[in-house]
């Protein structure tokens, strides 16, 4: 029986994870790589970072060649997202629950989990991206804006190997479709269509992304420079609840999933806002373990609020009461943080969100 349960757990877990990966808009291989997936019980993964390439020198047949030394640094990806599935199935014990009922609950779990992973992944991208603010995007200027991003990425030696992507809001996709330079996916092959790519422009594969983050228009990037670790800490299984003391003749579909995201190079990820976003800097606070955020541009008035590691992002014109963040005074409010935390800061005018910023806390931003 134990072997059967273990086999079912492995099968269910693989089914859900496969469905999750199929549902992700910010997909593995398209937006994120999975190069550092490993032990799901670890709280963090140390990732080597090298911005320089291996030195190539002339070889001396008599004396050989001197050994060169690379400059490898390390960055930390926190495995800080811990989500659980615990769905009650009434009137069935674990041994008698129908397969189609389990399949329905697994399908629902995969959908909900994929949405949350997409949300958390996008927040990490925005907090680690290089920001480009544009007053207005139109059918007349959108191509030149994308070409400028392409130029900046090429100057930063981001590979132009067919993997550069654009995540585009629906209203911006409508502008792209009017561009004569836009190549529709039907001309790019079946594999491109299957990946959800609408088309290609200036070397970027464009995928529509229905996101409501205030003023966000699109994200450009390359999967080599953003990574995701995505693992089951406890595999999906059907748990009998007869011994719980509360449930009789019932079971539950349970599982626990841990994951994390990390931007490895800010210049490889570009977030475009129109008409713009807040510009924010961080500095150590006065108290140990704190940071202070100073808004330097992009604001209307001086009313701000923040959230630490938000589970969703602020939409334009969200009311202050609906947002529910903590009040922030620019340059004064001290926020208790740890390295790798993400701070969302919103600018409120007439009681509504008008602009946002996302920023990842570095060790140098925290008072020791």
How should these model regions be labeled?
Residues 352-365:
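Extracellular fibronectin type III
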Residues 2-31, 36-55, 75-79, 86, ...:
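Sequence/fold signature of self-assembling virion shell proteins
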Residues 329-342:
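Surface-exposed, short loops/turns at beta-strand junctions within beta-sandwich domains
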Residues 284-295, 299:
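Short coil/turn motif common to extracellular beta-sandwich-like domains
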Residues 91-158, 271-274:
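Alpha-helical scaffold segments that mediate packing/assembly in large oligomeric complexes
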Residues 129-197, 319:
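Extended, solvent-exposed, turn-rich assembly/linker loops in the middle of proteins
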């Amino acid at each position: 029986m134990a072997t059967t349960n273990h086999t079912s757990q492995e099968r269910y877990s693989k089914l859900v994870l496969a469905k999750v990966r199929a549902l992700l808009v910010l997909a593995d291989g398209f937006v994120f790589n999975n190069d550092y997936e490993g032990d799901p019980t670890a709280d963090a993964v140390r990732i080597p970072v090298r911005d320089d390439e291996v030195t190539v020198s002339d070889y001396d047949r008599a004396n050989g060649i001197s050994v060169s030394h690379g400059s490898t640094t390390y960055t930390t990806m926190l495995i800080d997202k811990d989500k659980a599935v615990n769905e009650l199935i009434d009137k069935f014990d674990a041994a008698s629950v129908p397969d189609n009922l389990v399949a329905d609950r697994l399908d629902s779990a995969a959908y909900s989990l994929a949405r949350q992973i997409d949300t958390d992944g996008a927040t990490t991208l925005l907090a680690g991206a290089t920001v480009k603010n544009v007053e207005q995007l139109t059918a007349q200027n959108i191509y030149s804006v994308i070409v400028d991003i392409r130029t900046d990425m090429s100057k930063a030696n981001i590979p132009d190997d067919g993997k550069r992507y654009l995540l585009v809001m629906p209203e911006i996709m409508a502008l792209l479709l009017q561009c004569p330079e836009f190549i529709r996916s039907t001309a790019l092959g079946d594999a491109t269509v299957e990946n959800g790519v609408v088309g290609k422009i200036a070397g970027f594969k464009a995928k529509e992304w229905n996101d409501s983050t205030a003023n966000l228009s699109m994200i450009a990037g390359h999967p080599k420079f953003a990574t995701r670790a995505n693992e089951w800490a406890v595999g999906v299984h059907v748990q009998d609840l007869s011994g719980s003391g509360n449930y009789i003749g019932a079971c539950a579909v349970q599982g626990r999933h841990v994951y994390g995201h990390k931007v490895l190079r800010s210049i490889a990820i570009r977030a475009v806002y129109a008409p713009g976003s807040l510009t924010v800097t961080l500095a150590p606070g006065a108290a140990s373990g704190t940071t202070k955020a100073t808004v330097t541009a992009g604001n209307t008035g001086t009313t701000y609020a923040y959230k630490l590691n938000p589970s969703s992002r602020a939409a334009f014109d969200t009311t202050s009461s609906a947002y529910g963040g903590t009040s922030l005074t620019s340059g004064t409010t001290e926020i208790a943080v740890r390295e790798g935390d993400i701070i969302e800061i919103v600018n409120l005018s007439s009681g509504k969100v008008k602009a946002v910023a996302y920023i990842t806390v570095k060790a140098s931003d925290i008072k020791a």
